[in-house]
């Protein structure tokens, strides 16, 4: 007898409502937005991952709770549950938080999505990939090391590279310009839609929809 059949039989015998096992459905996802904790980093380019998750939680009228290795919020969409993780480990140790929560939630790698900034993309450009290299991003590099694989999805949000030689660090932890800040809500909306599509229509179709050039004026800079 299959496990689900046995559950239904026991539910009837015990006169209890039948429950669906979340682990069996595969409808749970971990969305890790990368950034650095602290008010001084809140509006910096390197915190684009945090900004996306904050926007999603706010739109869903939910709040983050401080848990081990990070802040966690839960949002739902069409029967899917998304655990939004903002690691408290600082960027370079993001893998500790992602590995812990993947194990705790017992999720397969295909149900992990990481959102981060990318210097190699123009500001506002968004790219989703099912797998790939770290691209020089220290947060992705640590996640790759902790998970011992590159077979997990990531969404890169372009922050541009408008800095002089040797100025990379100051640029990524520098505040967004006024024009960039004005564009952030639209960027967050597109990323959130992309993640929802990832869970409903699959990664390939989600990538085709998300990985398009922004329309005129969409980047805001």
Residue ranges and their predicted role:
Residues 136-139:
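Hydrophobic alpha-helical segments within soluble ligand-binding/sensing domains
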Residues 2-131, 141-155, 162-167, 174, ...:
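Nucleotide and nucleotide-moiety/phosphate-recognizing core
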């Amino acid at each position: 007898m299959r496990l689900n059949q046995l559950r239904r039989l026991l539910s009837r015998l015990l006169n209890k409502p039948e429950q669906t096992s979340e682990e069996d459905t595969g409808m749970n996802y971990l969305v890790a937005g990368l950034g650095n904790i602290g008010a001084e980093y809140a509006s910096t380019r390197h915190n684009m991952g945090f900004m996306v998750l904050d926007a999603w939680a706010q739109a869903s009228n939910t709040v983050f709770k401080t848990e081990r290795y990070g802040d966690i919020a839960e949002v739902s969409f069409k029967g899917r549950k998304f655990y939004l993780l903002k690691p408290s480990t600082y960027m370079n140790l993001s893998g500790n938080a992602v590995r812990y929560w993947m194990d705790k939630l017992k999720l397969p790698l295909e149900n992990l999505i990481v959102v981060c900034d990318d210097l190699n993309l123009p500001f506002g450009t968004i790219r989703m990939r099912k797998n790939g290299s770290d691209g020089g991003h220290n947060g992705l590099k640590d996640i790759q090391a902790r998970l011992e694989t590159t077979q997990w999805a990531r969404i890169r949000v372009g922050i541009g590279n408008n800095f002089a030689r040797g100025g990379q660090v100051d640029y990524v932890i520098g505040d967004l310009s006024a024009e960039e800040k004005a564009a952030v809500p639209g960027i967050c909306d597109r990323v959130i839609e992309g993640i929802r599509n990832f869970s409903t229509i699959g990664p390939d179709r989600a990538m085709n929809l998300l990985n398009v050039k922004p329309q005129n004026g969409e980047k805001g800079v």
